[in-house]
């Protein structure tokens, strides 16, 4: 994992792995992974928005997909992208992502109980550049680049 200064929406971005590395099975423990702790006050659904740099597939079988699954009671994985685009250069979604300089993807997770949890971002397609993660527990207002970052140390 490499922090790339000035590439993120609000500062540095994370490059998860080497973009020229071969495809990997995302469930493998060897894939690039970033984890973020968060606290949920209630059980229920949470929408996870990932903002990633829009990129073209480097290999024909590459699809920028991460599976969405619950790893344990408190660890969750999300899908970074919606999959391969047959012709990304002519896709409306691709066009909007390039104009915004990020592709915004949404996954919905179910939180079983209140408390501390961990969001795990794992990639089977190394090289994805993660710019921002937003957790919406309900009531988030729509905006072009999402809400401002909240950092609690």
Model-predicted segments: where are they?
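Extracytoplasmic
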Residues: 1-153
């Amino acid at each position: 994992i490499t922090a790339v200064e000035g590439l993120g929406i609000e500062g540095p971005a994370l490059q998860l792995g080497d973009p020229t590395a071969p495809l990997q099975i995302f469930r493998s423990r060897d894939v690039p992974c970033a984890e973020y702790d968060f606290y949920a006050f209630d059980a229920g659904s949470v929408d996870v928005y990932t903002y990633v740099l829009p990129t073209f597939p480097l290999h024909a079988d590459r699809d920028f997909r991460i599976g969405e699954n619950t790893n344990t009671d408190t660890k969750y994985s999300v899908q970074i992208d919606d999959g391969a685009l047959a012709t990304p250069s002519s896709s409306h979604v691709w066009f909007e992502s390039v104009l915004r300089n990020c592709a915004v993807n949404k996954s919905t997770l179910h939180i079983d109980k209140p408390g501390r949890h961990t969001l795990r971002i794992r990639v089977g397609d190394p090289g994805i550049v993660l710019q921002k993660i937003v957790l919406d527990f309900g009531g988030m207002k729509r905006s072009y680049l999402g809400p401002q970052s909240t950092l609690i140390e």
